[in-house]
């Protein structure tokens, strides 16, 4: 349940849907497995996984939701070879070339015949709805997957006025300034990884890992006009992260010491532990968002 990535969105209008109403709305779009002829299925599933019993898990007016996607795995090469074999057979028997429309129909037939025997894979994407911040945090490193979840949520609710999080000034300008100064604003602390890009197309990209970012070798690249587009940070003693210039957060990791804060809850009651972990994670992510918005100079004003 602990989030590992953050793709960030904000509401244009306050989110005022109560837990019960949200649960009811999502119930109409519950996930169901693929049938023999389905290529893929996508829907909402229990927020807390197999041990959960509801599509929405809420605490302190913070709502956790989860979408599950199942996809049949049909290798393109298998379809291509089967189609070529079928086309060659028909063309040989009928002594003519098949038209594109006929080939497309044959391809559909082949896919239909392969679907019942195809393996499938499932993936889950979770999101945290934070009305207090007017934000949605999607646990995904892929903007495409995040948008898929939001599209499904929009379909369930009828409308979802959200936009990607954006700041008053480009994120890379702040990251570059932090690197120049040798430190990030508290409670953030720079670590030993960064990616610098030149604004010119031919300027290239430089990546540093496990290196002191205060060294002259690193700073020399700033002097040539490169800007910082990725920067590894610690948020206090609780979270390690990689902040990117598109305002997304990758490789989010809660420290063992922080997660141990719920050890007193124990593991005898799995649901109680999951509930406690969710409350702990939610509170810290809210604190992280407050600190991030402040460190990056505030959010860009939205237009209704």
Swiss-Prot record:
The keyword Signal does not apply. Keywords: Cytoplasm, DNA recombination. Its main location: cytoplasm. The keyword Cytoplasm applies. It is found in: Cytoplasm, Nucleoid. GO terms for molecular function: double-stranded DNA binding. One of its GO terms (biological process) is regulation of DNA recombination. GO terms for cellular component: bacterial nucleoid; cytoplasm. Belongs to the RdgC family. May be involved in recombination. This is Recombination-associated protein RdgC. The lineage of its organism: Bacteria, Pseudomonadati, Pseudomonadota, Gammaproteobacteria, Alteromonadales. The gene is rdgC.
């Amino acid at each position: 349940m602990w989030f590992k990535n953050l793709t960030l969105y904000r509401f244009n209008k306050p989110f005022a849907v109560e837990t019960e109403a949200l649960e009811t709305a999502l119930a109409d779009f519950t996930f169901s497995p693929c049938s023999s002829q389905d290529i893929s299925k996508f829907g909402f599933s229990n927020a807390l996984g197999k041990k959960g019993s509801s599509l929405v898990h809420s605490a302190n007016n913070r709502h956790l939701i989860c979408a599950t996607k199942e996809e049949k795995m049909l290798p393109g090469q298998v379809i291509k070879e089967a189609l070529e074999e079928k086309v060659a057979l028909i063309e040989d028997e009928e002594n003519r070339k098949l038209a594109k429309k006929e080939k497309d129909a044959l391809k559909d037939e082949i896919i239909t015949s392969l679907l019942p025997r195809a393996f499938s894979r499932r993936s889950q994407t979770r999101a945290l709805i934070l009305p207090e911040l007017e934000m949605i945090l999607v646990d995904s490193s892929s903007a495409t997957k995040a948008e898929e979840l939001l599209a499904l949520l929009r379909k369930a609710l009828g409308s979802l006025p959200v936009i990607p999080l954006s700041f008053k000034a480009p994120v890379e300008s702040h990251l570059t300034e932090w690197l120049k100064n040798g430190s990030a604003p508290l409670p953030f602390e720079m670590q030993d990884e960064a990616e610098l890009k030149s604004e010119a197309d031919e300027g290239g990209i430089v990546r540093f890992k496990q290196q002191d970012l205060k060294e002259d070798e690193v700073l020399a690249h700033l002097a040539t006009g490169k800007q910082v587009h990725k920067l590894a940070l610690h948020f206090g003693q609780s979270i390690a992260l990689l902040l990117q210039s598109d305002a997304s957060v990758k490789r989010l990791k809660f420290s063992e010491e922080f997660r141990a804060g719920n050890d007193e809850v124990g593991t005898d009651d799995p649901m109680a532990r999951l509930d406690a972990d969710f409350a702990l994670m939610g509170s810290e992510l809210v604190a992280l968002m407050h600190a991030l918005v402040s460190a990056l100079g505030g959010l860009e004003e939205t237009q209704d």
